[in-house]
């Protein structure tokens, strides 16, 4: 078998590669800048067919299996264990690489209600996102920034991997899409809490801390707005303005998660 890092990566960044691989259905991009200036050694692009795992108010979806909403934490964790068991295992495994497949996505804070008895004070949000949503793609590109080389990991036969490698190389040789620099419109985001309500919340938080009820409380507010922007452009802007450890861009069905 050829060495895993057998694709030249000196002409592309993970961002340009993600854009060029549009026809291969990229699912996520994971990058990292450490210390505010030093790029992490590895970046990752997951793409192609994938196992989707989603829990919302109606069902617990694990691939083709549509299960009932878990009644308790035990059922929830058992479902996640099943998802990990069913997740594709891209190969070859590379010892030093920190990610070689698995579930990539998010779990919302409200999942805590499976583990703690909490009152339901706030009204349900319209069009609320799933409680959790993960994707586990069959194919993974690993960028090694120290050697300027790329590895293709794939859950399939070696002949399938070879054919996919050719498709990846052909895509990377092509131009970046013209939409990569397209501009869009947006309305300024609006906070769900007014300034006055937020200040009152800060005051109550201080009272809870002084009374010993809590030792830490993160008061937050949801912001929402309308836009006609490509979510990937939002990620690019965030990446330029605030390069950070653990940057992510995830396409999860109709939902895109950026941070």
What label would you give each PLM region?
Residues 1-259:
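Extended alpha-helical targeting/anchoring segments
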């Amino acid at each position: 078998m050829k060495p895993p890092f057998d694709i030249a990566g000196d002409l592309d960044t993970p961002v340009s590669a993600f854009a060029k691989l549009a026809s291969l259905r990229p699912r996520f991009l994971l990058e990292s800048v450490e210390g505010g200036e030093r790029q992490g050694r590895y970046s990752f692009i997951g793409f192609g067919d994938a196992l989707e795992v989603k829990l919302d108010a109606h069902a617990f979806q694990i691939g083709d299996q549509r299960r009932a909403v878990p009644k308790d934490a035990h059922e929830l964790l058992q479902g996640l264990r099943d998802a990990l068991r069913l997740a594709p295992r891209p190969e070859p495994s590379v010892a030093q690489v920190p990610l070689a497949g698995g579930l990539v996505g998010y779990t919302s804070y409200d999942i805590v209600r499976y583990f703690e008895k909490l009152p339901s004070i706030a009204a349900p949000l319209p069009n609320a996102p799933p409680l959790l949503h993960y994707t586990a793609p069959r194919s993974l590109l690993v960028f090694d920034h120290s050697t300027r080389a790329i590895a293709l990991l794939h859950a399939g036969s070696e002949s399938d991997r070879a054919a996919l490698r050719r498709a990846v190389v052909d895509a990377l040789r092509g131009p970046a899409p013209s939409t990569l620099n397209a501009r869009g419109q947006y309305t300024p985001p609006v906070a769900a809490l007014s300034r006055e309500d937020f200040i009152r919340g800060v005051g109550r938080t201080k009272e809870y801390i002084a009374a010993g009820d809590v030792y830490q409380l993160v008061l937050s507010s949801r912001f929402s707005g309308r836009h006609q922007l490509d979510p990937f452009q939002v990620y690019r802007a965030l990446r330029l303005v605030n390069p950070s450890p653990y940057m992510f861009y995830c396409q999860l069905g109709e939902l895109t998660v950026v941070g």
